[in-house]
Amino acid sequence: WTVVTTGCKVMAGLPTPRPTASNPCTAALDAFIATVQPALDADSRIGVALSGGADSTALLLAAHARWPGRIHALHVHHGLQAAADTFVTHCAQLCAGLGVPLHVSHVDARHQPGQSPEDAARTARYATLAQQASALALGPVLLAQHADDQVETLLLALSRGAGLPGLAAMPAQFKRHGATFWRPLLQVPGPAIRE
């Protein structure tokens, strides 16, 4: 896969939703931060992986409310869906409305023989997010996986006959390609995020 990074700035004419204190994403983010606060420098810039979907949008809004001026949105354009350019436009408009820098990387995520398209896209995505985080000198990169994703991953592993190591839950914190990734929403059901 190849990576080309470009910056996007688009002015949006739409109002930007703001999270409230009772928002499940904000509450989950605050609870998660209480456990990892010592690992976060007071002035660290933080990445949010932004696909343009409801879950990552909600996480971006919560993170922006929690750390105004410190958030960078990271979008990976896989080019695998016809709507991929529409996602970039949505992300650019959202970030412009928030005043959050958006960094878009285009990757060639075609799968190799013996590799599933999902695995190829995931491999390219994590490598690209790590490259973006390194280039921007970011602290952690926040991912929007939630409780429903945990269940889906477990069921998929069971259906593939995974052994005990393959049935482990998604970690809330991990390192990959030299970058630190956090999943602060793992305890939040998907529908609660989309409220």
List PLM regions with ranges:
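Core alpha/beta nucleotide-donor-binding catalytic domains of modification enzymes
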Residues: 7-195
